[in-house]
Amino acid sequence: MQKPITGGRAALLLALLPAAPGIAAQLETVVVTGSRAPQPVSELAASIRAVSSEELQLVRAVHISEALSRVPGTWISRGNGQEHLTAIRSPVFTGPGSCGAFYLAEDGLRLRPAGVCNVNELSEVNSEQAARIEVLRGPGTAVHGGNAQHGVINVISAPPPEARDASLTLTGGPNGYARALGSYGDRTDNGAWRLGLNTTHDGGYKDDSGYDLQKLSYRHDAEWSGVTLQSLLSLGNLEQETAGFVIGQDAYEDSDRQKENPNPEAFRDNQVARWYGRFTLDAGPGVLSVTPFYRYQDMRFLQHFLLGQPLEENGFKSSGWQSEWRVALDDALELVTGLDGEWSTSFLQETQRDAVPGNSVLPAGKHYDYEVEGLNGALFAQLAWTPLAATRIDAGLRLEHQRYDYDNRMLDGATREDGTPCGRPGAPVPCRYSRPADRVDEFTEPALNLGLVQDIGGGQELVLSYAHGFRPPQSAELYRLQAGQLVADIDSEQVDNIEAGWRGTREAVSWQLAAYYMQKENIIFQDAERRNVGDARSRHRGIEYSVDWRFAEHWALAADGTYARHRYDGNAPLQGLPAGTGIDGNDMDTAPRAMASVRLRWEPREHTTAELEWQHMGRYFLEPTETHDYEGHELLHLRLNQQLSRHFSWSVRLTNLTDEQYADRADFAFGDYRYFIGEPRSLFVDIGWQL
């Protein structure tokens, strides 16, 4: 019986695969996000786009949004500095738990423990030195479970080299931007290792802004006595001076306001550490893999976007394991089953230095101080059946349990820190911030997926799939309450997705097309009275495409994009809406219908690549009534990469070639428009050295 390809054999296979510069080799690209083991995209009943190493090196992203703009249905909405919000087959979600809709991972392991997500957590992974970034769109498979509701972003670490190797890339750009990416690795008697260092300084385009960022990745692979080990240590440190929203309708079109920063006092400091070790060995007729891991994070930042600008301090420690046993039951049937577990302890404190003038419900002092102990356990099974040579059927089921043990370290209730009410003497009122009493909350949910891949000949395939996903409430949604609410009676969000696809390669053209329809229930939101409730619904449908056409010997045209509608299903009483406002069928806010990246690539000779990218962002509404909107924008980017010799290379990147005035993110809140203004035309130069 042939054993599945896993462990050290998997690492070797992935290391030997050539990187695809565009979409042309996507069907042959091997990914691990769908099942935790190397698998060609052509075998998966899912929509996965892998941004290859060559693409990452050509883009040399200053912000991860630049690299992922070429993934259909995906928008990493850039804030200031390293900040961002995520959208995959969804609007851009905001709010304390909205990030729970996405499974953000490094080598298949979540960047943060279940229930403790952060909207900016992609900044905590060394994507700048990754082997590739895999994006699965739609609910994940049985190996993911909670949080893989709208999609998965999996950053794959660079493997150790086959022989001693070293590289250094220096980047310079506007506003004092400077970055050094260094890598060194070698082989040992029973394995190999690689050390990656990333240090970046950005002086900031906006006034009184900028950041210093350091990341380290140490990958070590080894094999002894029939056991293979893949391990990774990741460290990160961010010190950021944050610029806030610029207020006023169409402010991004005013040349005198391009560098404006209304919040020069804002900052974000964040330190992270992660380690895992994946041990793989033969076990009976199959292969067993066990991956213990550890995570640590500590953050301080000023909430400049809130009245009173309270200081938030948060962090966590977590440890656990992933496990799986992979066995071929016969020549046509493979089973993957496993047990995952995780423990975490997290904390959050919020303190406001000064009272807000004229607003008695926002007092100075401490608002929150709590700890949460989290336990997460899951059992899963995934079957792959090939009844005919041209037919593959996948089915997966996961049962996941999440438990929170919450400890309030302040007085219970909606009072000041000392227990006195807010308001005026003789007219007491509850304070804005509410602290529940100590409690335990538990959630148990299933996730399942079913898919069919049918080879119809001529290098073409048809794909049909159904998936059910969920996300438990995040701890902040349960315990960081407002407006006198002392119990958040909310349950897990649920999503059902059906999808059909057509993909193939024919002569000089490769393509992937997908159409999906998704329904969500129990959506958690803050209502008009600032209470966390969970009874909203939404509908999502769209078409996604990836096409690569090599129309001449040295020329190729690639396009990735989406046309989608994300709409409210019902009249949820969202915060800020007058009572009785009808929004059923309206577009959700910050949900552009059309997004696209089209790239013309020219390779006149070996080691020379030029790329012109057109990036389209469609119009979107800024609030649920469809009264205020952002018109969208078109950007052009030019990139040139030249290998000078075996040891030296250089590249030039000109972003926003036409100097378009645009907004990276537009919003409407507190009665006015506000924007993160996009940066003007910018020139970046890279000089690279390779051993």
Identify the role of each PLM range.
Residues L13, S234, L383, V453, ...:
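Conserved C-terminal beta-signal and adjacent last beta-strands/turns
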Residues S65, S69-L109:
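Extracytoplasmic beta-strand/coil segments of soluble accessory domains associated
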Residues L109-R137:
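Short acidic/polar hinge/loop motifs at secondary-structure boundaries
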Residues D165, G172-H201, K206-A243, E265-V287, ...:
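Transmembrane beta-barrel wall of Gram-negative outer-membrane proteins
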Residues A243-N261, L306-L311, L348-H367, D405-V440, ...:
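Solvent-exposed loop segments that connect transmembrane elements
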Residues R278, P285-Q303, D455, E461-A467, ...:
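Membrane-embedded beta-barrel scaffold of Gram-negative outer-membrane proteins
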Residues A328, T386-I393, H401-Q402, S510-K520, ...:
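Gram-negative outer-membrane beta-barrel transporters
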Residues A328-V336, D340-E342, Y370-M518, R550-A552, ...:
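Structural signature of Gram-negative outer-membrane beta-barrels, strongest in the C-terminal barrel
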